[in-house]
């Protein structure tokens, strides 16, 4: 595991063309713009957590895959490759890549919806940053579902051969994130009192950047 401040190509184990993409993404805004342009990984073959190399090749990603790519790009430019996990109740967790500017936290995020996106570096603490996702983070039953956030996890603690240069799913990353200390955002009493999304919010929440492709029926299938 490398503890270098700046990642070289050989540290990540990527090819020249792959590394060149990360070299071009030299600001958090450029990284976020790149993630916006990646299509959504709808996991047609089942649950996936594909390394950076596979995401660069496939040109699609979901949240943790985008967060790993963003963290790799930050590391290439001398910033620590930090992830933060947000736990939800009866809902999917969300993972973002963290960065700081003048002591304030921001987040780079890959999502297919309107809400759990980029956050400008204006948050004094990770709790503040996580709370910025609180109101819109809702499950399919329209209940606000965000409950916890984690300490930053430094991806340099895991061999880049697993999460950057690998070809197989990097399940060690979410497993290690699960072990990181998490902090509650609301008490149980507060959680019970949270309101559901109103009808207008539900309409907005239905907006998606990329539509799930329809499965093509083979000839003769029913």
Regions found by a protein language model. Give the residues of each.
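A structural boundary/capping signal
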Residues: 1-222
């Amino acid at each position: 595991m490398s503890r270098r401040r700046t990642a070289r190509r050989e540290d990540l184990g990527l090819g020249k063309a792959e590394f060149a993409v990360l070299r071009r993404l030299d600001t958090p805004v450029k990284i976020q713009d790149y993630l916006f342009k990646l299509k959504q990984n709808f996991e047609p073959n089942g649950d996936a957590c594909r390394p950076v190399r596979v995401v660069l090749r496939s040109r699609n990603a979901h949240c943790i895959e985008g967060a790993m790519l963003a963290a790799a790009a930050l590391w290439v430019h001398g910033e620590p490759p930090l992830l933060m996990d947000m736990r939800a109740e009866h809902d999917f967790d969300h993972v973002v890549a963290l960065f700081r500017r003048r002591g304030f936290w921001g987040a780079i995020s890959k999502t297919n919806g309107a809400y759990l996106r980029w956050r400008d570096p204006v948050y004094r603490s990770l709790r503040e940053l996580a709370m910025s996702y609180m109101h819109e983070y809702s499950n399919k039953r329209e209940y606000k579902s965000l409950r916890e956030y984690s300490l930053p996890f430094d991806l340099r603690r895991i061999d880049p051969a697993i999460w950057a240069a690998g070809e197989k799913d990097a399940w060690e990353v979410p497993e290690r994130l699960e072990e990181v200390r998490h902090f509650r955002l609301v008490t149980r009493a507060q959680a019970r009192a949270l309101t559901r999304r109103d009808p207008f919010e539900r309409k907005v929440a239905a907006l998606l950047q990329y539509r799930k492709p329809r499965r093509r029926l083979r000839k003769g299938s029913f």
